[in-house]
A protein has these predicted regions:
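Rossmann-like AdoMet
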Residues: 2-105, 109-157, 173
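Short amphipathic alpha-helix with an adjacent loop that forms part of the alpha/beta core around
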Residues: 164-173
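A short SAM/SAH-binding and catalytic strip from SAM-dependent methyltransferases
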Residues: 175-191
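A short glycine-rich, Lys/Arg-flanked "PGG" loop and its adjoining helix->strand segment in the class I
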Residues: 193-205
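Conserved beta-strand signature within the Rossmann-like core of class I S-adenosyl-L-methionine
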Residues: 203-217
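Conserved Class I S-adenosyl-L-methionine
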Residues: 223-246
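Short alpha-helix
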Residues: 243-266
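Core SAM-dependent methyltransferase catalytic element
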Residues: 275-306, 316
Length: 316
């Protein structure tokens, strides 16, 4: 998948953030590391719970507070905690209420406490986080340092899902629910295809997949508000190359349908936050859910890369 948001970012008069001379904000040298630390810092700064603070770094909290001061009332950074809150709100709708044994899998969890919360809320379920070995090691270290009790039904699997099929990482087991938060921004078209094939193969019949998605048509709305425009653009500049922004919602739906998934539903994070009585973030993100049918239908033709995509090696 190429980077459809590039023309937007090019026209925004972005603040200069030169990373060539090193990690100037101590968030990490790679886009995924910077993103994980910034998101963890935003959750800690804006939610300020024992778990979010424990899972964040000092530099992540400092940068998040700095951006929060710039952000003011635009609520750009609030969409980081909001997407987690909406996914937690939707989870009960996606798992069988009467099943005694459940397998809930979160992939590329980063420093999110969401799987920890799932393990606490669903003690009859086995909750598995799948992530890179260094991320798992650092997360365990932070939880221990923060004296966060780890439920007995939560465990970690160390795997690079770019090399290891998800089902192999789970020793052939299939899940009732697979979730992904914070990964989609970094996926190319081929990586999206691989992810959805992996998820379909690893879900039990009747199981659900939940993932957050970003859309070019929503980002274009930022240009109408200079304040939101500037803050959001700075955030995206910090996290680096983000090829996974899709042109629109129909582009996202094709990834589900190509693997035969049904009941595809979009939940606009800002709208759901309003419905549950929480502060609404700026409308940048949606949560998409879908179901693996009980019987497999004929597979549709493979999804094609979006027609208006920019070159895959482009940078924001």
């Amino acid at each position: 998948m190429s980077s459809p948001e590039q023309p937007i970012v090019e026209n925004l008069n972005l603040p200069e953030f030169n990373r060539r001379d090193g990690d100037k904000m101590a968030l990490g040298h790679t886009p995924s590391t910077r993103s994980a630390e910034l998101v963890a810092g935003a959750r800690a700064a804006l939610m300020n719970t024992k778990e979010t603070v424990a899972l964040s770094s000092t530099s992540g909290r400092v940068v998040a507070r700095f951006l929060s001061d710039i952000d003011g009332k635009t609520q750009v950074l609030w969409f980081f905690p909001a997407r987690m809150m909406v996914m937690e709100h939707l989870t009960p709708k996606l798992i069988p209420a009467d099943k005694s044994e459940l397998l809930l899998v979160d992939i590329a969890s980063g420093f999110s406490p969401r799987a920890l919360h799932m393990a606490q809320k669903y003690p009859h379920a086995e909750v598995v986080e799948v992530d890179l070995p260094d991320v798992v090691a650092e997360k365990k270290k932070r939880l221990t340092k923060g004296r966060i009790e780890i439920p007995g039904n939560l465990r970690w699997v160390e795997a690079d899902l770019g090399k290891t099929p998800l089902r192999d990482a789970l020793d052939g087991r299939q899940a009732d629910l697979i979730t992904s938060e914070g990964l989609s921004l970094y996926l190319t078209h081929d990586e999206y295809v691989r992810l959805f094939n992996n998820v379909e193969d690893t879900l039990l019949p009747g199981g659900h997949f939940m993932i957050e998605m970003y859309f070019k048509n929503k980002l274009q709305e930022l240009r109408k508000s200079p304040n939101i425009n500037g803050v959001a653009s700075f955030v995206f500049r910090m996290v680096g190359h983000v090829p996974g922004i899709l042109p629109d919602q129909s582009s996202a739906s094709k990834y589900f349908t190509q693997v035969g998934m049904t009941d595809i539903t979009e939940y606009v994070v800002a709208d759901v936050m309003g419905e549950i009585g929480q502060k609404k973030p700026v409308d940048l993100i949606s949560i998409m859910t879908a179901r693996k049918p009980l019987t497999k239908a004929a597979t549709p033709p493979p999804a094609e890369p979006p027609a208006d995509a920019a070159p895959a090696d482009s940078q924001p």
